[in-house]
A protein has these predicted regions:
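Basic, Lys/Arg- and aromatic-enriched nucleic-acid-binding interface segment
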Residues: 148-151, 155-212, 216-218, 226, ...
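Short, basic (Lys/Arg/His-rich) helix/loop patches that form interaction surfaces
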Residues: 185-195, 257, 275-377, 381
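A short, basic/aromatic helix-end/turn motif that makes direct DNA contacts
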Residues: 25, 217-223, 376-382, 390-393
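Short amphipathic helical patch at the helix-1/turn junction of helix-turn-helix
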Residues: 133, 204-207, 365-366, 391
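N-terminal core-binding DNA-recognition domain of tyrosine site-specific recombinases/integrases
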Residues: 2, 24, 28, 69-147, ...
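Conserved tyrosine-mediated DNA breakage-rejoining catalytic core shared by Y-recombinases
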Residues: 218-276, 280-294, 298-300
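N-terminal DNA-binding module of tyrosine recombinases/phage integrases
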Residues: 4-10, 15-107, 275-316
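Catalytic-site neighborhood detector that most strongly recognizes the C-terminal catalytic loop/helix
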Residues: 170, 236, 372, 379-404
Length: 406
């Protein structure tokens, strides 16, 4: 097991005179080692080669999809992309035999997805290009394994469609302040912990530009209250099925960010709630709730503890407690009210939670001396990862300039 120059963990070993290689995108070292161990066991048991030999012969697209998922794609971090794309292809041109596919089938796929529609749906150029790439990758792997032999090999050249990338939306300063006021007032009036946590999420995301999935994976131990920094080393992977699964960030690397006073105040409030929640039982919290007068913040904390909101932290060390109960679905559903308040009505999700990340990025590039390389380091973008080793962020400039100081 080794890490390549892009920061991706890779396998490269020899068994019975055969060399095996594989990459594990967006996986931590522990996850990659586990996947490599499972792979080696499959090879030793003979399952690996049996899969290839049994697949030779007539194979339809749906069978190819299952074969490639079991052999390759289930080891990738994003397990849905290839399946979704190939299922689109099957819906558009039918479950054809792989070896009989021709260039004409590719043009039929293009015409149906972009012009005629598939079951009444017209797909975007991005969706078509993704499906085309997935199909090309599948055919290349199958041909390389000699699972199929094409009667007339399809030519993918020149089929991709030009994509016009629109400008990423960002909120104006006045919109950020209106959103902050809206969330603050709702949190103050409501007894719901989720309303308070959405306000806290807004403060952090509008200052640090985290991906929502990164915020949902933060534990108290990721925050340095001594140095006013936060380390982002995890993200929630929502595409792997039911339940919360924590993996590496999108670029596979951790980063440490400086936090302004407004963000640290949020983190200190969260720590205070967690300390209280772990120090009293639900019965004790209910008793204290009835006894304490005047301190609304403390009363609400006891109320939430008495209702069992922090039961998930009782058996955890303090630094392992998650800082929020929100997840992707609840946060986005609650954010919809903010969109409507700002006047962004309709079903378009251009001003979803991710707009806060785009807003921070647009503000950072305006800082003096904050170039594109520093932006990519701060935001955790996946490209130019090899350049991140040479980036030296001006911590004081970032802390003073990032966010809106709400």
């Amino acid at each position: 097991m080794y890490k390549n120059k892009n920061g991706t963990w890779c396998s490269d070993f020899i068994m019975d005179g055969v060399r095996f290689q594989r990459r594990y995108p967006n996986s931590t070292e522990t996850e990659a080692l586990k996947l490599e161990k499972e792979w080696k066991e499959a090879i030793r048991k003979g399952v690996w080669e049996t899969n290839v030999s049994s697949a030779r012969g007539v194979m339809k697209l749906s069978e190819a999809l299952s074969f490639l998922h079991d052999r390759y794609w289930k080891y990738l971090d994003d397990t849905t992309n290839y399946r979704v794309c190939l299922n689109r292809v099957i819906k558009a041109i039918g479950d054809k035999e792989v070896s009989t596919l021709t260039t004409a089938d590719l043009y039929e796929l293009k015409d149906k997805m972009l012009n005629k529609g598939v079951n009444g749906k017209i797909y975007s150029p991005h969706s078509f290009n993704s499906s085309l790439v997935a199909l090309g990758t599948a055919l290349r792997i199958l041909e390389g394994l000699e699972v199929v032999k094409f009667k007339s090999k399809p030519n993918f050249k020149g089929l991709q469609v030009r994509q016009v990338v629109g400008k990423r939306p960002a909120l104006r300063d006045d919109e950020l302040l209106r959103a902050k006021e809206f969330l603050y007032n709702r949190a103050k009036k409501s007894k719901a912990l989720s309303s308070v946590e959405l306000y806290e999420l807004f403060i952090v995301l509008s200052n640090l530009g985290l991906r929502p999935a990164e915020y949902f994976a933060i534990e108290l131990g990721d925050i340095s209250f001594e140095y006013d920094t936060i380390t982002i080393s995890k993200a929630v992977k929502t595409h792997k099925g039911t339940g919360t699964i924590i993996g590496a960030p999108k670029n596979g690397q951790s980063r440490t960010l400086p936090c302004g006073e407004n963000v640290m105040e949020v983190f200190r409030n969260i720590r205070h709630r967690l300390e209280i929640a772990r120090s009293v039982s639900k019965v004790e919290a209910l008793k204290l709730l009835r006894e304490i007068k005047g301190n609304d913040v403390l009363r609400m904390t006891y109320y939430w503890v008495s209702q069992g909101a922090y039961d998930n932290c009782k058996d955890l060390p303090l630094d392992k407690c998650p800082i929020t109960h929100l997840n992707h679905d609840t946060a986005n559903r609650m954010w919809w009210a903010v969109r409507n308040h700002l006047g962004y009505l309709g079903t378009s999700n251009t001003h979803g939670l991710y707009v806060l990340r785009h807003t921070v990025a647009s503000r950072l590039v305006k800082l003096k001396g904050f170039n594109a390389y520093k932006l990519m380091a701060f935001m955790g973008y996946s490209d130019i990862k090899s350049s991140l080793h040479y980036i030296h962020l001006n911590v004081d400039d970032i802390r003073d300039g990032v966010g809106i100081s709400v």
